Amino acid sequence: QDASLHIQYVVPQAGTSVKLGEAVMTFYGPLDNTYRYGRAQDAPNLNTRQVNKYSIVTRIVYGSNSFLMTGDAQQETIKKIVARGYDLSAQVLKQPHHGYQDVRLQDKPKGRYVYDSDHKYLIDRTGASIAIISNGYKNVNQTPESNVLRDLSGMDVYQTSDKGTIVVSSDGKNLSVSAQKGGNVPSHAGYVVKQKRTPLMQKVTVQANTKKKMTPLRSDASA
């Protein structure tokens, strides 16, 4: 810290909030008090994964609009936040960790890597309609990974790798998205699979031309 700048700083605590004008930002994480500032200061053994676990996670509410900002949070961090019972609903989700499938090596033999992404339990709880993924120019790391993109399929997904700078604006009621490239056209358009109503098995009585009475079953799709 540069004392000559005379800037007061506060270390946020999970569960506390600050006002940003008329918006309110609530801190959900990190939930671990062993955090060390910087990648190596006072903790030379911290690797990138450990540092990412201490990403600040916040929920911002402005009027009727809400945003969930997750930084580079890893699955351990997100699971702790989910377990706390925080309100995770949001219209806009900043997808954790660039859209990586950051499964741990010990989880791979269990088959988790093949199906759900690490943060599906978070994605399902947000109910978001817009997802933002920060990934590198030319996307050499090929994110988001397929599992993540599949779990985000109900949202409009915007990636910085092909959209450049992405701005989501709110007036407290309405949201708008603009990007450096391609305007408001998403990188991947979301879709919602309409659930088909289950056909009902209806019992009907049929009077035959004979003296016998038949009571067959028929399948009627409800209107």
Q: Model regions: which residues?
A:
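A glycine-rich, often tryptophan-bearing local segment used as a flexible ligand/cofactor-contacting loop or short
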Residues: 1
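Active-site regions of enzymes building and remodeling cell-envelope glycoconjugates
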Residues: 5-9, 155-157
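Core dinuclear metal-dependent hydrolase active-site scaffold
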Residues: 7-92, 164-223
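Cap/insert and terminal regions of metallo-dependent hydrolase folds
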Residues: 78-165
